[in-house]
Structures are given as structure tokens and as C-alpha cells.
Amino acid sequence: MRAFLKYFVVSTILCLVPGVALADNNPPPNTCTAVSFPAPQGGTLAATLCMPSTPTSTIMVLMAGSNYNHTYWDFPYAPETYNFRRAMNAAGYATLVVDRLGTGASTRPPSATLTATGSVLALHQIVGAVRQGLPGAQPFAKIITGGHSLSSGVAVIEASTHHDVDGVLLTGFSHSLDTAGTLAVVATYHSAAEDPQFAGQGLDAGYLTTKPGTRAADFYGAGDYDPGVLATDEATKEVFSLTEYPDGLTSTQPPETNLIDVPVLIVDGSADKLCLNACASTATLAAEEAPYFCPAARLRTFVLPGSGHSVNLARNTAAYQAAVRDWLAAMF
């Protein structure tokens, strides 16, 4: 860990980002710092640390899934509604939003070298660094990892293997995979090198992305999106590699989630085409998922009505943000 921290790099430039008010329309600004970590496989992982306006000992380490980068958690369009990071900062929690290797501002290695196992190791090392204290921030006593889809699988494996976090937020995750819906999404993938958005970037053929104009059907409930959100989502779409999927999917195989011994919140959309029957309601999801978790997980669930796979970007995402705040307040 000392070697890891030795190479930890933090930028010297701080950016002030307006917070999202819960009651005050002009809250103090949040302080955000660009940071980077060495990736276990080589290269660097880019991240942004944001502190709330009041002192806190709790931090959420957030990583996006495939098809997304940091913008999923730190959404630039109508941030007062859709920016999850800002909502958590406004609630008094620190956040560290991390780009997976191969995405965002992180290093892009050959696509075949990307795996969920590599992301698990990276997340584990980041958690250790956060626990000891990042430059410009005190050590955090409580660390909650948060994932979406693929990175929820990463968070599961990290927590069940290393037992070094205090809570786990899983979104776009369940043990009820809709095979037909999943295959329909996969059918919209194509080589990023063939996509106008990534042409000329020198990406190898293994890097994939969604075909233009397919994200509404893939990740949203029918009509459950602001046109500006969808346009921003298409404009900020990300690449990924199918080599990240096989070991990522082991997170849904017994006994993986049963080994998590800290509080867990699962959030899904009722119209998520990747989820079969479990996502019909909060109660249904709780009943379906309960056998896969031990009592120490104190499992909570929340289903966002009408939302597709990307709950951060649904019209009613504020209800999901409120559910997360309630869970954090109750458990930590």
C-alpha cells in the first residue's frame, strides 16, 4: 500500500463546482480535486474527489459501468436534477468518482487486457488509499462503494473478497437477468473504431460502443427521459471491452453476494430491460434478492418506477437519490 500511495498523484488545481441545494438555493460551493491512481495493470486511473461544504468522515467511491464514464455520476446536463455526485455532496457526503481503465480520462490499454478482475484490484487499492487519507483530505472512517451495472459487479467482488468497505450501493444489478433483453442491448454494440464519435482515436477493434441513436431503447424506460438528457448521454457515451463481462458476471454466482458483511442497497428501474421479474417493485426485488445476502448485509432495495437501466438519468431520479440518502443516514 505504501508503494501505491507513493505514486498517488493529485493535481494542484482545485475547481469550485456549485452544489445542489436541498433547502438553500445558493449553497456554498463544493471543492473538487482531480486525482489519479496507478492502475495495477499499468497506466493511470483518473478520478475526481469532491468534498461537501461541511466536514464529513464518510465518502462514496463511485465507478460507472460499461458504456459510461465519470459523467454518469457527475452528469453535466441539468445537474440540479441529474447529477448524483452533487446530490450526495449537498447531503453532506464526500465523493470520489473514478473512471475505469479504458474509459474517460484513464489510460486506454489494449482492449483484450481489460477485465473486471483488474477493476476489482484497482478499486481495492483505491479504497486503501482513501482509508489512509488522500492529499488535501483527511482519512475517511466510512467508505461506501457505489456501482452501476458492470461496476456493481466489481463492487460486489471487491467487498466479498477484501472486506474493507463499510457499505455497498448496487444499481442496475440483480440476480434476475433477462436474457432476451440483454441480447437486444448487445445487438446494438459495434466497434468503436467504426463510430463517428471515436473515429481516428486509434482504438483497436475490441473496443465497443453503442450504435448512434440506440441508447434510449437500451437504457431508458419508454418515454422516461428528458430529450436533453438523452442527447447528452449520446454525446458522452463511452467505450468498453467484452473481456470485462465474463468475470464481472461471476458477481451474480453463489456465494459471491452472500459473503458481503456490510450494509447493501440495491436500486433498479422497473423498466430495466436487463432485469426479468425481480424489478417489478421494491418489495418484489427485496424478496427475490434476500436469499443471496447474509443478515449482516441488512439488505435494502429500491425500484424506481418507470426507469430503465440507467437510474441516474430517469426523469424521477430524485426519488432514487432520496432513497440513497435515507439509506446512508440510517446505516452510517
Residue ranges and their predicted role:
Residues 297-332:
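Catalytic active-site module of serine/aspartate enzymes centered on a nucleophile-bearing elbow/loop
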Residues 25-55:
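N-terminal cap/lid segment of alpha/beta-hydrolase-fold proteins
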Residues 183-282:
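Alpha/beta-hydrolase
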Residues 113-136:
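Alpha/beta-hydrolase active-site loop
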Residues 270-304:
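Conserved loop-alpha-helix segment in the C-terminal half of the alpha/beta-hydrolase fold
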Residues 54-93:
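Short, surface-exposed "cap/lid" segments of acyl-processing enzymes
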Residues 141-177:
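Conserved hydrolase catalytic core segment
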Residues 71, 98-114, 309-310:
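Glycine-rich "HGGG/HGxG" loop immediately N-terminal to the catalytic nucleophile
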